[in-house]
């Protein structure tokens, strides 16, 4: 695990002070000594360069998607209502409660159970009968991370592969190298008893000479490399593809060039090819892309139960500067019982400063930001889940999708604002939504400067919720706070 250090321009003295305390931050038991001001050593021997970090942390959709895959330990029981729009509304709508009802090949059923699946998830109940239907049906599906979406389309690919035919028959596009590998691992695990079915990766670094005879039946890759393999190197004959999967469509269109490359690949597929598209969200741009690339689809949408603030008590504390904010935070910590807490900062510099202050005062703290690799983030979140650190300080990279049951308090050390310096309502909602999870009650504290009070009032009006002022010096008032 890397130990991170960020350089600021707050002056050499403060920088030196921060450097001295930051080396054992992420894993306190690992005292990484001798850190230079310009570089930070990782445990694996590599080095992180320090950069200016007064900017807001940018949320990377692909990285967050991979992170959610890495930290899921089991299927999530979705709180969404599944809505199915059939291509032919008059045809009967089937769902299944067991995998046996799907009449799968014995080796596939063994693979599913070996992976730990006991019964289909809510999404799988509706999607699998469509994906495995004869003749094949196209599908556009919305699915949150952790609901078994990848397993569902992998099952569809493995079901339609003819192991005796030694050429690519199933093609899956993913937006990144890492996400492609994650999908491939699911193929390899589910297909472990399908002895004659193999997977190949069309990803950067996997250089295959032009004219090579590709004999593996399932190809998983990124759009650019797949396009090169199909049209330039002639490694894949798209007219022989039986199943085409486009995964993470919302991430795909967020990456320059991938949308056009994906459409070019899809247009070379035969009309009888089954086409499946998955996306976590369905903004207008994603929906327009999906309709362009998937002809005559069935559609599965999720009607999300609204994130509610009703079970979260919200407070604000007026402060003069960040030291006042920290003192108020200490007073709150001294007055109420806290399980685990997530503290959000707008910039990496503030996150680093706050982390060092809390470490100096003996708190068990970990720091999460966009500068860490996805594996490092996953490790930090797992440690936080395991209770090894009680406080997670983060930027917006952790604002959504990460559920830790023990979190009882969320602190906005900085209010979330957009580039126009207006309140970022959606980020606020997802930040404080990290507490009050799973039907439990939670607390949210906003540390704000006086000139930011109008922004907070806009947030209060927007959500039609009450945000009460708290006097951080009144310990009696703090001690009366209840969940």
Curated annotation (Swiss-Prot):
Top-level class of the enzyme under EC nomenclature: hydrolase
Residues holding ATP: 143-150
GO cellular component, one term: chromatoid body
Catalytic activity: ATP + H2O = ADP + phosphate + H(+)
Domain of life: Eukaryota
Domain (Helicase ATP-binding): residue spans on this chain: 130-300
CDD domains: SF2_C_DEAD
Compartmental location: Cytoplasm; Nucleus
Location of the motif Q motif: 97-125
All copies of domain Helicase C-terminal, residue ranges: 311-478
Extent of motif Nuclear localization signal: 100-114
Family annotation (SMART domains): DEXDc, HELICc
Molecular function GO labels: ATP binding; ATP hydrolysis activity; mRNA binding; RNA helicase activity
The name this protein goes by in its record: ATP-dependent RNA helicase DDX25
